[in-house]
Amino acid sequence: MKKTSYSLIKLIAFFLCGSFFSIAHAEDAHTLYLDTKDGRITIQLRPDLAPKHVERIEKLAKEHFYDGIVFHRVIDGFMAQAGDPTGTGLSGSRYLDLKAEFTDTPFKRGSLGMARDPSDKDSANSQFFICLADQPQLNGKYTNFGEVVSGMELVDKIKKGSKSENGKVTDPDKIIKLRLAGDNS
C-alpha cells in the first residue's frame, strides 16, 4: 500500500511540474524584452492581429539582429522608431518585405507598429515603432502587432530627435539587446 501511495504522489508531482512549466512557457510566448541603457521594456506581441509581422520580429530577435541598433527617429508625442541596421531609416533586414496586416485595433500609447514606406503598404521589413501617445491617424493604415506591458517610462526616456528634421536623432540611444522571453543569450 505504501509503495502504491508513493508512486501516486510521484505521478501527481510529475504532472503538476509539467503543468507549471507549460504555464510559465505560455506566459513567455510572444513576449519580447527590449533592453536600453535605462532598463528593460517588456513587449507583448499580438500574433492574433499580425502573425507574419510577429513571426518576423521573433525571427530577427532570435538572430540578435536588433542588438546595438539605434532609435534613429524619435518624435516627442508621436513615436520612437528603430530597426534599421544602417540607422538611416532607409534599410531593413535581408528578408523580403512583408504584406500589410492592417486591423482596426487602435494605435494607443505603448502600441507596437511596423514602419514602412508611406507610399507602399507592403514594404514593412524590420523597422518598428512604439507610440508615445495615442495615434488614431495610424489606425488601419499601419500594422499594429504588439504593446508595451511594462517599462513605458523607459520608452519615454529615449532621446528625442528634432521635429524640424522629422525626428532624426543626433547621437541616438541604442537597443542594447532585444530577446524573446526565455532566451538568456
Language model feature labels by segment:
Residues 22-185:
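Cyclophilin-like peptidyl-prolyl cis-trans isomerases
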Residues 10-20:
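Bacterial N-terminal signal peptides
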Residues 1-12:
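Bacterial N-terminal signal peptides that target proteins for export
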